[in-house]
């Protein structure tokens, strides 16, 4: 069997100067990617000292999925499940951005009820994605209890989304002009009741993980992103607001 040599230009070699500086400063060079155990492929080379990242060299391009090219030969409606895969943990908001672009281009007016229902769907999807991220963050800390709390919260929301669309992921429920179908009052009542249970579980998660002294000791002052850098890097969502920028695209 003849061994297959990997392409030499698969990724850029680590700079010798980068390694030398790390050794002189008693730091460790940690190359990550382009393949790793997570769901997204990336290539970053870090210089770390303890839990602190001193420097990093990112190499972008490993998660490019050619969405624009794939969409060229499809109908508008066929692209809905395609663009949901940009962030499969938050498909409703990926879909909403695409559908609104179509509506704005064609001058389509969306009924008021559909706008409200879209907002409910998008918020549920956003919270579900947030607690997935928070759960993985807890797991990285070795806090399995926090991880299980997040997954329990996420499962409640996924069950509600399944009641709406019939799908646990990739619902393709938001379409140009409104929704694929109406949401019944029974399901809306279920969501209303669920919010109270969610609030209690969220408060519990805050007490066992967010306000945990170990979490604070390990996370405080690590990876600080200033307001100026957040704006310069084009950050959005909770990352932007956590840096002190009072901006929420949902209110624009």
What residues fall within each predicted segment?
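Active-site bordering "gate/hinge" segments
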Residues: 1-252
